Amino acid sequence: MEPIWAVGLMTGTVLDGNIDVALIKTDGERIDDFGTYRLMPYPQSIRSLLEETLTAARAWNFVGPEPAIFRKAEEALTRAQSAAVKELVEGYGMTMADIGVVGFHGQTVLHRAPQVGRLGQTRQLGDGELMHSLLSTKVAYDFRSADMRAGGQGAPLAAAYHTALMRSAGASGEVAVLNLGGVANITWWDGADNVVAFDTGPANAPLNDFIKSKGLGDMDRDGALGRAGTVDEARLAKLLQHPYLTKPYPKSLDRFDFGAAMADGLNAEDGAALLTAFTAGAVGKALDLLPTRPKKLVVSGGGRHNPTMMAMLASRAGVEVVQAESLGWSGDAVEAECFAFLAVRVLRGMPISFPSTTGAPQPMRGGKLAG
């Protein structure tokens, strides 16, 4: 199959007010060209709307009709992300006619993992048909629902792309990819046919929520608060006894499954230190679950910009930690690139999730296609 140009979109559960947009050329198996990437801010009005929507989603919790705010938020974010796609493509000297497909993940507002006797449920806001009409380009969307209807976790979906990246870099077995978004997820590949992926625990979401609750901004910028704080080791040890952390994979999390309340009663510095250490400790427990424990973690996502997080990963997870850029990847772009890659797989009828990554009963094609 000939590679085609595809655009990927991602807005994470951390709600940082930005749209990640990436352009790659791929056949859905290999990456032919890393085109370009941009981080484009939402207008404040949409950011506020999404925060209200997340609150409404948690109150709804898949019971009864969807909150009315979903429709309003869905249209607003679809229009904003469509504009971001056009701006990226035209800024790269191309037109939408050059783009084979857009991968539109949408905004996750609620994700409930399956339990024994109960299928999981997930809701991403994003109107693929509207985006198709705005861009006149095929749009792949709703990537997670089919996997969950079949009994899978619906997450993480990055495994196919992470594996393609590792294959291109000749990295396997002793190397794993860790993405630090709102939630942290890991992908391990044995270099042959075995790929394992799962959510390890929280990453930026509880830390950012805690910082916001203290009125100190949106995040622990440069890890300054966490670095200045002291970790309550007894409290951390108790938190690390959470059964999720030793539960066998496949497994997935909602961004609110581990919350800022873990640091209740602590000052800003000590709370940031505790939450950062918890993320690192949870990753360490995840590494112990893998078929072989990797010696190196290649880290992507926003959390890698936090030097305290990176240092704690090395010391508390007992692993060498390197930036995605050390392998020639763009660590900020990986998630958006992933959905461009998956969109091509949807377009070509290829699976996007697997029994060893989401627990689906067989490789799942997934995704819907508009256009």
Swiss-Prot record:
Keywords: ATP-binding, Carbohydrate metabolism, Kinase, Nucleotide-binding, Transferase. Pfam families: AnmK. One of its GO terms (molecular function) is kinase activity. It comes from the Bacteria. Coiled coil: none annotated. The keyword ATP-binding applies. It catalyses: 1,6-anhydro-N-acetyl-beta-muramate + ATP + H2O = N-acetyl-D-muramate 6-phosphate + ADP + H(+). ATP binds at G12, T13, V14, L15, D16, G17, N18, I19, D20. Pathway: Amino-sugar metabolism; 1,6-anhydro-N-acetylmuramate degradation; Cell wall biogenesis; peptidoglycan recycling. Its EC number is 2.7.1.170. GO terms for biological process: 1,6-anhydro-N-acetyl-beta-muramic acid catabolic process; amino sugar metabolic process; peptidoglycan turnover. The keyword Signal does not apply. HAMAP family: AnhMurNAc_kinase. NCBIfam families: PRK09585.1-5 (NF007141). Catalyzes the specific phosphorylation of 1,6-anhydro-N-acetylmuramic acid (anhMurNAc) with the simultaneous cleavage of the 1,6-anhydro ring, generating MurNAc-6-P. Is required for the utilization of anhMurNAc either imported from the medium or derived from its own cell wall murein, and thus plays a role in cell wall recycling. This is Anhydro-N-acetylmuramic acid kinase. It comes from Mesorhizobium japonicum (strain LMG 29417 / CECT 9101 / MAFF 303099). The lineage of its organism: Bacteria, Pseudomonadati, Pseudomonadota, Alphaproteobacteria, Hyphomicrobiales.
